[in-house]
Amino acid sequence: MAFDLQVFNAQTRDVMTETIDQDIAKFNEASGGAIVLMNKPFEGDFSIEAAFQAIGGLVRRRDAYGSGTLTPKRLKEMLDVAVKVAAGTEPIEFEPGQYHWTLRNPELAAIKIGEQLAKARMADMLNAAIRCAVAAIGNNAAMKHDASSAAPTFNALNAGAAKMGDRSGALRAWVLHSTTIHNLYDNALTNAERLFTYEGINVVRDPFGRVFVVTDAPDLADSSGGSGTKYNTLGLVENAIVVNDSNDFNA
């Protein structure tokens, strides 16, 4: 009996969607909400939301007897823009006769392909998010701390957190390469608490309660300088990275 291709594709998609929904929920919780992955499609090529920008220096010291000129503050809006990125998979060849010969149900192939696609899709979402975060933070010199001249230490992470001043307590997570975390271990940072493990993504916690999201995302390693590989480590607050799945994963 020939296995219906439409049914096969539907089963593959159902398994992929169910698997990724479950693992996204676990990942979001384990990462402290610093990286939020979710299945929430939006219309059009962009999602644009406006919000009022915080006004600095609203309270001032005044001279009760003065008559000087005051400089007014302006209420401004800022835009939160999300860009839709298309993703898909190569066509996957499947021979039902192989399963009939071995007396197995061809539906097993749909299940296994769906599970593999879910893992690959989640990794792609994370890599794309990290690529954007590295570019965004890298263009803000005030939020960068260069410790590439020495092996990574917890002191270096603390110096990076200090860039945020009294807002450093808002940091929820460090996103770092596996090479960096191993060097931190070599420098006496010991932590056996493993919160989440998923296809090359590990989440552990530092002494201040910030979690370490360990993944070998391509943009966490930079070999472009010609003087060896430098590793990027991101300190993230809650909802620093939000990735919506567009629910349009096609071949």
Task: Please give the residue ranges for each predicted region.
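Short acidic, glycine/tyrosine-flanked loop/strand segments centered on an H-E-D-like triad
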Residues: 75-104
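Generic detector of well-ordered alpha-helical segments enriched in charged/polar residues
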Residues: 9, 13, 17, 21, ...
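Extended oligomerization regions of viral-like shell subunits
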Residues: 162-251
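A generic secondary-structure signal marking the coil-to-beta-strand transition
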Residues: 46, 88-90, 172
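Alpha-helical scaffold segments that mediate packing/assembly in large oligomeric complexes
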Residues: 96-169
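Localized chelating/binding microdomains
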Residues: 49, 86, 132
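Intrinsically disordered, low-complexity boundary segments flanking structured domains
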Residues: 32-40, 70, 74-81, 158-163, ...
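N-terminal "assembly arms/tails" that initiate or stabilize quaternary assembly
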Residues: 1-83
